[in-house]
């Protein structure tokens, strides 16, 4: 039987992608351009719970790439995002407004069924990688660079990049299109893992993407 069109997850139920019954806890580390949009996408696809880790606060410049509102400026990102997700879909997100470091990573990530690293610096990414390997947790790394390149890679194949000479990704002029493309790929990858344990790795380069028009008849 098809799902009722009254359901807020009608499309996901038809596609076999509904996550409402999923009892696995996804932990998203970093609630910036990638993490905040990925959390919103997963919540709108039906994920009923997640953990959000970020110590930063919403700034005016975040509004162009992140799902926050003007009224959220000055608020802690993790808490503002948790409220947004609950209002939108009743997703219950545990907000942890702490900076993840090598000293507290084990404690913050423990109890997760999947860790998604959406951080923007190598030191924190390394702390996540060290912790998930110690705790034997599956981990997906998602990120992009200032030259229009992005990747969605499982930890087994991931090498933490040296960001000492890398430009701020948000300085890339097409940050929002690339970010949304990358979030879509990451969301599909997370869902495939949650539903059947599949692990796929991807690289995304916006300049190589081909969108071809259909021929007129």
Q: What are the roles of these predicted feature ranges?
A:
Residues 48, 91, 135-137:
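A short helix->loop->beta-strand "cap" motif at the edges of active sites that frequently abuts
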């Amino acid at each position: 039987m098809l799902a009722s069109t009254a359901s807020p997850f009608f499309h996901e139920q038809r596609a076999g992608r509904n996550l409402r019954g999923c009892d696995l806890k996804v932990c998203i580390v970093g609630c910036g351009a990638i993490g905040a949009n990925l959390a919103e996408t997963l919540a709108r696809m039906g994920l009923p719970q997640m953990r959000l880790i970020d110590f930063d606060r919403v700034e005016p410049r975040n509004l162009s790439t992140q799902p926050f509102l003007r009224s959220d400026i000055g608020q802690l990102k993790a808490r503002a995002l948790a409220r947004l997700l609950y209002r939108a879909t009743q997703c219950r997100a545990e907000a942890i407004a702490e900076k993840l470091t090598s000293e507290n990573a084990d404690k913050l990530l423990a109890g997760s069924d999947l860790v998604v690293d959406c951080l923007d610096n190598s030191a924190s990414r390394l702390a996540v990688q060290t912790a998930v390997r110690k705790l034997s947790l599956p981990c997906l790394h998602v990120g992009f660079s200032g030259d229009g390149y992005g990747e969605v890679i499982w930890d087994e194949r991931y090498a933490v990049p040296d960001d000492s000479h890398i430009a701020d990704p948000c300085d890339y002029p097409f940050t929002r299109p690339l970010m949304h493309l990358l979030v879509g790929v990451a969301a599909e990858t997370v869902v495939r893992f949650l539903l059947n344990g599949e692990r796929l790795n991807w690289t995304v380069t916006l300049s190589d993407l081909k969108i071809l028009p259909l021929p007129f008849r």
